[in-house]
Amino acid sequence: MNICEAMGMSISHFESILKMTQRELKEHLVQQLRTHDYEPVCKSGFLYAEGTVPVLLVAHLDTVHTHRPDIICCSEDGRYLMSPYGIGGDDRAGVYMILMLMRECHCHILFCEDEELGGVGARKFTNSKLRPDVNYIVELDRRGRNDAVFYHCDNPDFTEFVCSFGFKENSGSFSDISVVAPHLKTAAVNISAGYFNEHRPHEMIDTYAMCENIRRLTAMFRQNTCHFPYKERVHARGSMFGEQSSLFAPMVERPSRAATCKLLMPLPEETRLYMGQHQIGSAPEYRMDRSGNLYMYLERLNAAVEAEGVFACDAGGHPPVFSAVCEGTRFLQVYTYEEAVEKLEQAKNAS
């Protein structure tokens, strides 16, 4: 059994989506959303559905191809799809991936029209009164199998979160989240949807790549996270080539990152903790990030605060080694000391 069969992918349903016009697809998606307990909002330029998982999924309904792909060729093992007219995987693959994802995760969903014309539908969405309250945004509109494209969003903690699921950061020019993310002030990423050679007649879709990324994203969406804010990538203005340059970007002060999320690993039970020459605390009370920084875990807040001046080692004096796959490793809200004290006081007064 291949991964698509194991995940219940319907090739016939996917092929029908590939053959629909943008208008037909929008009508079809309204029915699909209602079937899965959504109440879709259908407007000129976009289709939105509020979910219960604080993640916004985005894909676009149009393709650049002018001919309906009535002839679809499939490889013998069922993995690859092509059409002599251009199959339109950009972005029907992303649309179908969202339909599969919503079976397991009731995320917020946004389908945009006319992305290929410059994000027309996305701009109409940002001009509407809709403003979903989500922790981050995932678009499924990227070529390849393993890419994560953040465009002008520069939130290192969000990048680390996404890449901890095996995706690799890459660059890109534009997609609907380039418009939606800064509007919602929320970090966003464009993930590979398994298509290749987009905008060409010999475009190809790798259904195995689609299903593998559905599997990874399902695991991602089941992680409890805080809100990842949108942070604009900093560039110095001016260049001899007439473009913005990042040459002096390190000299520009970045926004404060006091309240953020970090991937933190529990320390092994045998770990010894020291402040100066004095042994302190116990390992279960502390967490470590991938840079080796230590944090005290605050169970009352289900959060952490950086433990300045504390270092950890085993009986032989060796520091613990960070592992993203270690049991108990997860993203936690990290507060400054002052924020932690304030929130503990609030929790005490509320009880």
Predicted ranges, named:
Residues M7, I11-V53:
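A non-catalytic alpha/beta surface segment that caps or lines the substrate-entry region
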Residues T35-C42, S75-E76, G166-E169, S282-A283, ...:
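Short secondary-structure junctions
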Residues Y48-G89:
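Catalytic-core environment of secreted peptidases
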Residues V64, Y85-V162, F167-E169:
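Acidic/histidine-rich catalytic neighborhood of metal-dependent amide-processing enzymes
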Residues K168-N213:
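Zn-dependent metallopeptidase/amidohydrolase metal-coordination segment
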Residues N197-K262:
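His/Asp/Glu-rich mid-to-C-terminal helical/loop segments that flank catalytic regions of hydrolases
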Residues G281-Y335:
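Acidic, low-complexity, intrinsically disordered interaction modules
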Residues A340-K348:
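A short, charged, amphipathic alpha-helix used as a generic interaction element across diverse proteins
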